[in-house]
Amino acid sequence: MSLLPRRAPPVSMRLLAAALLLLLLALYTARVDGSKCKCSRKGPKIRYSDVKKLEMKPKYPHCEEKMVIITTKSVSRYRGQEHCLHPKLQSTKRFIKWYNAWNEKRRVYEE
């Protein structure tokens, strides 16, 4: 043990420690904000014919489930809005199944 007083760390070390602490705090808050899935609730009742596009996005790090996003036609009552459907709901699974069947049938008639 020394009798001499300890020297304070240099200013650059204190700045580096403060910057590292701020970076860790920013990463933690970003993770907390982004931890919720967009498709956590049941979506509105939409007819197959009102759907312009159906997208199935893969799992992301912030969400444990895949995302099912539909875009409605601009002439429908939803006026081109995007809706996210909960992928585990039975109604969403049925919607995807019947939308794909309806879309295949529609393609045959359009060709």
Curated annotation (Swiss-Prot):
D-box (motif): residue ranges: 67-81
Domain of life: Eukaryota
The UniProt record lists the keyword ATP-binding: no
UniProt entry keywords in alphabetical sequence: Chemotaxis, Cytokine, Disulfide bond, Secreted, Signal, Ubl conjugation
Entry remark concerning the domains of this protein: The destruction box (D-box) acts as a recognition signal for degradation via the ubiquitin-proteasome pathway.
Protein name: C-X-C motif chemokine 14
Description of what induces expression: Up-regulated in peripheral blood lymphocytes in response to bacterial lipopolysaccharides (LPS).
UniProt function note: Potent chemoattractant for neutrophils, and weaker for dendritic cells. Not chemotactic for T-cells, B-cells, monocytes, natural killer cells or granulocytes. Does not inhibit proliferation of myeloid progenitors in colony formation assays.
Tissue and organ distribution: Expressed in heart, brain, placenta, lung, liver, skeletal muscle, kidney and pancreas. Highly expressed in normal tissue without inflammatory stimuli and infrequently expressed in cancer cell lines. Weakly expressed in monocyte-derived dendritic cells. Not detected in lung or unstimulated peripheral blood lymphocytes.
Localization of this protein: Secreted
Single GO MF annotation: chemokine activity
Signal peptide: 1-34
Modifications after synthesis and translation: Ubiquitinated, followed by degradation by the proteasome.
Main localization (coarse): secreted
GO CC annotation terms, alphabetical: extracellular space; Golgi apparatus
The keyword Ubl conjugation belongs to this UniProt entry's keyword annotation: yes
InterPro entries: Chemokine_IL8-like_dom, Interleukin_8-like_sf
GO biological process, one term: chemotaxis
Gene source species: Homo sapiens (Human)
